[in-house]
């Protein structure tokens, strides 16, 4: 079985409870940054916020409910960014530029049910409307291996989305919906979403998660560069 990004990610997350942060010092060099301020985010002037929904901590790292973290972690890796806590906020942030567009990636330091608390205050401070917020999350009503883009709509019982709507005061934010399918007969939804994926699902050669990860990352970059209509036409017509 080939080792995939997902498997590497799992091995890292099982050892720590928060996104990787830089050391405070480097040998023979100046101290590295250990945090960001809201003022620095305002200077960066992001045109988009992208948040992945999940629960913090190694206990939940490889569960279905945390699938929304994976595309933003891949983006951090791709753009050689780093996670830093935001002073006075319930979030870790990473700053990337997609082509020429500044983008703020976020991870909530709260649990899933309070995910919106990471976004609402920052969106307000940055004067970004909800339409410029992309939420990556797990979706029971979409088959495992499929990714769908949605401009707005209800929360479908998803507590993370409920928190987003409550904090933003609107349902008009963009969703990258990552299908995990429905639980098998006899398994409750809670047990299903809080249980880990099977090794076969994340196998680099035969599993479906690599396709899901690629499509969700592409969804984000396509939305940022071209808008939701073009992104949807591309992602929704892909065959795996």
Swiss-Prot record:
It catalyses: an N-acyl-L-alpha-aminoacyl-tRNA + H2O = an N-acyl-L-amino acid + a tRNA + H(+). InterPro entries: Pept_tRNA_hydro, Pept_tRNA_hydro_CS, Pept_tRNA_hydro_sf. Pfam families: Pept_tRNA_hydro (PF01195). Gene3D superfamilies: Peptidyl-tRNA hydrolase. GO terms for biological process: protein quality control for misfolded or incompletely synthesized proteins; rescue of stalled ribosome. PROSITE patterns: PEPT_TRNA_HYDROL_2 (PS01196). TRNA binds at residues 60, 111, 113, 159. One of its GO terms (molecular function) is peptidyl-tRNA hydrolase activity. GO terms for cellular component: cytoplasm. The keyword Iron does not apply. The record marks 55 as: Discriminates between blocked and unblocked aminoacyl-tRNA. The active site is at 65 (proton acceptor). SUPFAM superfamilies: Peptidyl-tRNA hydrolase-like (SSF53178). Hydrolyzes ribosome-free peptidyl-tRNAs (with 1 or more amino acids incorporated), which drop off the ribosome during protein synthesis, or as a result of ribosome stalling. Catalyzes the release of premature peptidyl moieties from peptidyl-tRNA molecules trapped in stalled 50S ribosomal subunits, and thus maintains levels of free tRNAs and 50S ribosomes. This is Peptidyl-tRNA hydrolase 2.
């Amino acid at each position: 079985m080939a080792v995939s990004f997902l498997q590497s990610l799992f091995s890292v997350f099982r050892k720590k409870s928060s996104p990787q942060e830089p050391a405070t010092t480097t040998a023979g060099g100046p101290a590295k940054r250990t945090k960001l301020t809201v003022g620095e985010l305002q200077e960066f002037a992001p045109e988009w916020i992208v948040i992945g929904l999940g629960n913090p901590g190694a206990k939940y790292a490889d569960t279905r409910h945390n699938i929304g973290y994976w595309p933003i972690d891949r983006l951090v890796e791709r753009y050689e960014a780093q996670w830093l806590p935001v002073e006075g906020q319930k979030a870790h942030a990473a700053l990337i530029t997609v082509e020429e567009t500044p983008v703020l990636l976020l991870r909530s330091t709260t649990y899933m049910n309070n995910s919106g608390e990471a976004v609402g205050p920052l969106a307000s401070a940055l004067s970004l409307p909800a339409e410029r917020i992309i939420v990556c999350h797990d979706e029971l009503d979409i088959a495992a291996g499929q990714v769908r883009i949605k401009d707005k709509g209800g929360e479908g019982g998803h507590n993370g989305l409920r928190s987003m709507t409550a904090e933003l005061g609107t349902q008009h934010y963009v969703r990258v919906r990552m299908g995990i399918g429905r639980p098998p007969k006899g398994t409750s939804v809670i047990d299903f979403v809080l249980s880990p994926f099977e090794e076969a699902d994340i196998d680099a050669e035969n599993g479906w998660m690599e396709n899901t990860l690629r499509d969700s990352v592409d969804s984000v970059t396509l939305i940022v560069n071209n808008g939701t209509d073009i992104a949807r036409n591309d992602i929704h017509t892909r065959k795996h």
